[in-house]
């Protein structure tokens, strides 16, 4: 049995932590879903201005989370497997999504003493209704993976590189430049980054330059932070400092590839952290399903963690990072409990005449 590639378990854990931190920045502080609340009073003190720069850097560092998660998926699923096995995995994932959607909505409805049948229907059809945009895209990639793997296996290294080049042109976009996410191309973008992960698995890039990809990731994020922060603090035309966000298919595409390549070049760690990452790997997706549920999101960022109340405190960054770690730990613990309880349910007994029927 081949040794487990624990560096990718660690990267999967890190990428989900980045997703949670990114949600703190863009949901908890910037309030991207409620633009009328976009005002952030960073500029009212020197400490607040420092925290603005740190928050902008945190947002850009964590912008890569979804991309890296899909690249990891591509790395492991680029090996051909039957559609039946992938379908079964997709069904189990769909049932988990429905479970959390319905359970969380039911608890919220009981607390509010209100019930909306249309909202319940939305929770029962999470993929079709795109309740979770990321999970909708992930499910599509999962079901397409056997066919993408067969295609990738049939390509030479050069052909694979040309395919990635074409997909880069078709998917890269920044503001008014490029295709961006139009005409339903977000799924095409996920196919692109899935195939990037697959390319690393099949063709294993090598060379001394890989050791510098981690530095390229950090320096690019620092440079972008400097550009965004300095331009606003010196030349801003609005009364508030605005946290800049970037689409996953612009600069974060480059930084996510850099981070993924750097991790792929590392030896598999054997530390306690890596061991914990391996143990928690089956529960990582539950972090997204729980904390990003529409009923949990506002409660989490606006009423429990409330990051905007700490913008002028010196410990703001430590508080934000610690709060996100607690969110992850709680979500993982909840899913561990769910699986423990479900394991206590006895399996369905086979029909007494099943063997006889099978022999006919």
Set out the residue ranges of the language-model regions.
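Membrane-cytosol interface segments of multi-pass membrane proteins
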Residues: 1-167, 270-273, 303-360
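Interfacial loop-to-helix transition and helix-capping segments at the boundaries
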Residues: 53-66, 122-137, 175-193, 226-258, ...
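Small-residue-rich segments of transmembrane alpha-helices in multi-pass membrane proteins
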Residues: 96-101, 193-195, 282-289
